[in-house]
Amino acid sequence: MAVDPEREFKPINIAVLTVSDTRGPEDDTSGDILVERIRTAGHRLGARALEKDDADRIASRLNNWIDDPKIDAVVITGGTGLTGRDVTPEALDRVKDKDIPGFGEIFRLISYRTIGTSTVQSRACAVVARGTY
């Protein structure tokens, strides 16, 4: 699928979820960067939240946003590592219809260029859930 340069840009509403046991609203730098990049790209922040590394809470938040007609997409930062606390992919498994396997592959390729083989510690992923990506 090629990008059509003639196609009109349509901004969407994006929700940002930070998953962390150690960050709060005052020091959520990853969430802040995502919000800034969403706005710089011309999209709108539809919602923002911070959840602890708890699969039930993450899945509940995602279900609420997926069901919200004002949210077009959700971006999550955190919880994709290899420790026992990292449960974001497992929470996504509870709400997804389909995986988008190429996302994780490209994410790790780009990360490899910066951090080398440490990128294998990331379980970054993307899914489709009831029409929300």
Regions found by a protein language model. Give the residues of each.
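Non-catalytic beta/alpha edge segments that cap or flank active sites
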Residues: 1-133
